[in-house]
Amino acid sequence: MTKYEILYIIRPNIDEEAKTALVERFDAILTENGAANLESKDWEKRKLAYEINDFREGIYHIATFEAETTSEALSEFDRLAKINLDILRHMIVKVEA
């Protein structure tokens, strides 16, 4: 299994309840599609380098997990993050051991 890290930026004006539901939903997408050893945590609210969708800051969230390279977890997360309006940007990287 390969170790991956996902960093995504959530819009800053989301209420706490909706943010928790969003994070739980995307964590479930990963685990239901073959990801293991998931660690998910809020990083912090930070100012963005440039404006995204009229927002100047965002809530950074980071998730680390292990998955097979052929796993659906990565592609499904990527697909759903692109169409979710609460996620401003996301990035998936493979962690070198």
Swiss-Prot record:
It holds the Pfam family Ribosomal_S6. Coiled coil: none annotated. InterPro entries: Ribosomal_bS6 (IPR000529), Ribosomal_bS6_sf (IPR035980), Ribosomal_S6_plastid/chlpt (IPR020814), Transl_elong_EF1B/ribsomal_bS6 (IPR014717). GO terms for biological process: translation. One of its GO terms (cellular component) is cytoplasm. One of its GO terms (molecular function) is structural constituent of ribosome. Transmembrane segments: none annotated. Gene3D superfamilies: 3.30.70.60. Binds together with bS18 to 16S ribosomal RNA. This is Small ribosomal subunit protein bS6. It comes from Lactococcus lactis subsp. cremoris (strain MG1363).
